[in-house]
Each structure stands twice: as structure tokens, then as C-alpha cells.
Amino acid sequence: WSRFYAYTEESYLALMDEFQRRQLPFTVGIIDMDWHLVDVDPKYGSGWTGYTWNREYFPDPPRFLKNLHDRGMHTALNIHPAEGVKAHEEMYVEMAKAMGVDYEKGDPVNCDLADPKYIQEYFCRLHHPREEEGVDFWWIDWQQGGSTKVEGLDPLWILNHYHFLDNGRTGKRPMTFSRYAGPGSHRYPVGFSGDTLITWESLDFQPYFTANA
């Protein structure tokens, strides 16, 4: 289940209870971007990129994710990585230190997907801690262009590549969820069908549409 809606822990779990009551089977819970802080000071960007839980909505993330696991569901979080890491994020200082950014000035850690060092810290400091809390995989919702500082290197392609490899680092079968990145991009992720209507007719059409994207 995934919906672009500002769920809380309580409202999301109540919805899962209602699905169970109606005998509607769901095996994956994907939380859209409101899991993280979005209403941030404009000096920190748009709020679309984020890695810090919104504790007003999810006061105990490990408890919430465990509750979904206890229901037999896998879990994923939505991310828009383009704006990097800004000074309001809880892991900003350690990320800035690792990347040689002046954290005392609050300089942003820019997203540079062509930099192997950034890729390393991106996973180590932004994603692995969330996975330790119970996140199983990620929804890569890149919408910010198709170029990097390396000619021909598409940012969504490289994100799909590295997220797939990183998700399998413990020996499990890798899993990642992503937008369409051009011909052949089904090599790595399960494809995101795009925004849809919540109707049975739409659900019936989506497997055909996604398989032919």
C-alpha cells in the first residue's frame, strides 16, 4: 500500500487493520515522503529531500516498522535525493564532516552521484541507519533531471544501480523500487507505475501498463 498522504503511525496502522478486516491482502507498506520533515525553513530547500523522521507523525519509527513486519509486511520509504543533505537534518554534521563540508557554516552537502565518496557516505550515513530501524528497501523517486557532472551518466540509472547492489550487501536477494529511467531500466528496480486512481479498474490495468513501460 502506498498513497501520497500525510499518515501518522496511528492512522497508517488503523488503515492496515481495516484492510485486514475487509480481507484485502497487502504484503508491502511504502510510506510516501511525509515520513520525513517536509515543512522546513526555505533556506534548507524545498523539503522534498529528507532523511530525518517526522517525530510528530512517527514518534517511534522502529516500533512502527516492527508492527508492519509483525503483520507479514515488508517496508519501504520514499526518497527524493536531489537536494543532498542540509543543516536541519539530524545526521548533517557527521555527513558534512565525512564529505569535508564546513558544518559550522551550515554549508549544504550537495548530492553528487558521480562522486564515489558521496555514494559511500550516502548509503552509510543516510540509509543504513534507517534500515537498522526496519526499512527493507527504498522507493527512489528521482524527478530532478537526467544529467550529472559526468557526461552520459544519468542520475536515476546510477541510483538504481547502487541501491540494487547495496540492498543485496548482506547476501539477500536485492530489491529496489524506482521510477522509469529509460529503455532497459527494468534491469534493477521494480517499476513505479506512476500516480494512479484508487479504483479496481486502475489496479486491473497497472500490471499491463508497468510491464510494457
Regions inferred by a protein language model and the residue ranges of each:
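Catalytic-domain carbohydrate-binding cleft regions of carbohydrate-active enzymes
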Residues: 1-213
